[in-house]
Amino acid sequence: MKTMKFGIIGCGLMGREFASATLRWVHLKDEITKPEIIGVCDMNPASFEWFDKAFPNLKYHFTDYHDLLACEDIEAVYCAVPHVLHQQVYSDIINAGKHLMGEKPFGMDKAQNDAILEALKNHPEVFCRCASEFPFFPACQKVIEWAKSGKLGPVSYTHLTLPTI
């Protein structure tokens, strides 16, 4: 099983959620890449405490995300920072050659989204994905099917509400 070494930028709730999810992936038996968290970054060093307990073998703790991006052994980054920072931080991650698992929105407006897309165009080796997608959720599969078939016509806007259980 291949291991993908991750760094996390943003150690608040969403960073902890992602980290917790990686611990649940270890039971999968298929040919899947296993995530390993080796570095964390947050402006508040007190947020490292939870990660140190959950991941006692962490190699890196940074308060400046540029230091995390400079680590050659970090292959991918999960980023959970305030929306207004997405364009700059996501672009820096991509330009550093790191795979990106980000949160929506990918830019606060079209210009910011275009900047992120430009970084991706310049780094085709980088895999980038939104962590908040539901591509395998049955309702989403149906909508994807309808969109691909043309049944919905041109899609210009979507809004999805999921029931809470």
Where are these regions (language model features)?
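Beta-strand-loop-alpha-helix segment that lines the small-molecule cofactor/substrate pocket
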Residues: 76, 82-83, 87-133, 150, ...
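Conserved SAM-binding strand-loop segment of SAM-dependent methyltransferases
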Residues: 59-64
